[in-house]
């Protein structure tokens, strides 16, 4: 399973959008962006929540990355976006 997800800092509402391949419905992955990692180190993992926006099969991985890019094209201009 491949997910397009949004990780949100519940303290300041900043967020990160990404793609993650997983076999589990729930795992502890929040993202790999440098700004996001710094924020997790600063605020602690408890301050973040991850929500799945879209699910894809492994065969449709290219669609997951295309959807992520569509979202980033809109959200990268947002000052709240960690990406």
Task: Please give the residue ranges for each predicted region.
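Structure-specific nucleic-acid interaction/processing domains
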Residues: 1-83
């Amino acid at each position: 399973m491949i997910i397009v997800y949004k990780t949100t800092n519940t303290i300041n509402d900043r967020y990160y959008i990404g793609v993650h391949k997983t076999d589990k419905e729930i795992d502890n992955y929040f993202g790999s962006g440098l700004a996001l990692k710094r924020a997790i180190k600063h605020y602690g993992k408890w301050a973040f929540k991850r929500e799945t926006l879209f699910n894809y099969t492994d065969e449709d991985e290219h669609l997951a990355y295309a959807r992520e890019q569509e979202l980033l094209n809109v959200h990268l201009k947002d000052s709240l976006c960690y990406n």
